[in-house]
Swiss-Prot record:
GO terms for cellular component: extracellular region. This is Potassium channel toxin gamma-KTx 4.10. SUPFAM superfamilies: Scorpion toxin-like (SSF57095). Keywords: Disulfide bond, Ion channel impairing toxin, Knottin, Neurotoxin, Potassium channel impairing toxin, Secreted, Toxin, Voltage-gated potassium channel impairing toxin. Expressed by the venom gland. It comes from Centruroides sculpturatus.
Length: 43
């Protein structure tokens, strides 16, 4: 789910992150981006 995406994500301070996207899509969201080293899912 969305929380596990954030917990597991390791990415750059800003920008697109493929694994984020995959995890977020499984959680039912459209895509994922990185904000301050954390994954954010976009509904």
């Amino acid at each position: 789910d969305r929380d596990s995406c954030v917990d597991k994500s390791r990415c750059g301070k800003y920008g697109y992150y493929g694994q984020c996207d995959e995890c977020c899509k499984k959680a039912g969201d459209r895509a994922g981006t990185c904000v301050y080293y954390k994954c954010k899912c976009n509904p």
